[in-house]
Design a protein with these regions (language model features):
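N-terminal Rossmann NAD(P)H-binding glycine-rich loop of SDR-like oxidoreductase domains
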Residues: 4-26
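NAD(P)H-binding glycine-rich loop region in Rossmannoid oxidoreductase-like domains
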Residues: 57-96
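N-terminal Rossmann-fold cofactor-binding loop
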Residues: 33-38, 57
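Conserved Rossmann-fold NAD(P)-dependent oxidoreductase catalytic core, especially the SDR/UDP-sugar
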Residues: 77, 103-145
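Short alpha-helical oligomerization interface
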Residues: 84-101, 134-142
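Rossmann-fold cofactor-recognition segment
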Residues: 47-59
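Conserved mid-core alpha-helix of short-chain dehydrogenase/reductase
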Residues: 62, 100-108, 156
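Active-site helix of classical SDR
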Residues: 145, 149-152
Length: 158
């Protein structure tokens, strides 16, 4: 039986590390992408089963090459600026990393007919200030640039 392949984009953060550990336990081949292969988390560097892959999420040729090389069954998109507070002072990078990077992946997957699942990690920040139980159908009204960037990536992913 052929081994299942996963790519974790932005996989050196908290979600990426946890996801990679779970997938390795399920015997997946796991590729973790990062902006730089220097000074990364010890758990990532020490795990010889993980493949660490340098990737520019704004370069569609690099994305295409990654997908062609590894032919993943699933792509997890965890890349991006993750602080609502920092998003006010770094609006451009927040938008680019959370929305444009995600959009680039989806466009490359669609254009090249790659047969893989795509999971984009969203955030409760897409709903803004809400006091009720949140449902997927709840009104989406982000109150910061981070929430807006995550909402835009959520909308193009669904």
């Amino acid at each position: 039986m052929k081994k299942l392949v996963s790519i974790i984009v932005g996989g050196t953060g908290q979600f990426g590390i946890i996801t990679s550990q779970l997938l390795l336990k399920k015997n997946y081949k796991v590729i973790v992408t990062t902006r730089s292969t220097k000074n990364k988390n010890k758990k990532i560097k020490q795990n010889k089963k993980l493949i660490l892959y340098k990737l520019n999420i704004y370069n569609k040729k690099e994305i295409k090459s990654l997908l062609y090389k590894f032919k993943p069954n699933i792509v997890f998109y965890y890349a991006g600026q993750s602080s609502p507070a920092k998003s006010f002072t770094n609006k451009r990078e927040t938008y680019r990393s959370n929305f444009l990077g995600c959009k680039n992946f989806l466009e490359v997957i669609h254009k090249n007919n790659y047969n893989c699942k795509f999971l984009n990690a969203s955030s409760c920040e897409i709903f803004g200030r809400i006091n009720n139980k949140i449902k997927i159908s709840s009104l989406k009204k982000p109150v910061n640039p981070y929430g807006l960037s995550k909402l835009k990536s959520f909308e193009i992913t669904k």
